[in-house]
């Protein structure tokens, strides 16, 4: 029944505690071959004709990009799929496509001129990093220290 399901959900929610550790933004980047895109503010519609590099399916990052494009009326169909953000950067640096990358990690390659930022009309939402722990179970000393360290960072 629906009532039993609601009770179960509330019990599970009480059992887990979510601690916000921080947030970050992703930016759209490209290699030097795509410098014309960095010269103006682009729309998602305009970018549909360019090859996209993305993380593979079944990642929260990929899910966010699918949702972002869908919310603006466009499908997200990357041309190249990789398993890590480092691989994304390498392919983008070698002009194999454009893609999203964490802003903080893009700072140095941007300064060195290895990549360019493409500014978007449709802003990408911030990403949030959270720690979820089972509040009903005792934590080991090592786990407590790890959590304290993560919260301080």
PLM feature spans:
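Short beta-strand->loop
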Residues: 17-27, 112-125
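Flexible hinge/capping segments at coil-to-helix
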Residues: 13-52, 56-57
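Hydrophobic hinge/microswitch elements
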Residues: 66-118
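Short secondary-structure boundary segments
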Residues: 9-11, 32-33, 103-105, 122, ...
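Short, small-residue-biased leader/transition segments that mark boundaries at the very start
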Residues: 1-8
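Secondary-structure junction motif
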Residues: 36-38, 51-72, 139-143, 147
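Hydrophobic residues within well-ordered alpha-helices
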Residues: 2, 47, 90-96, 131
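A late-sequence structural motif
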Residues: 116-153
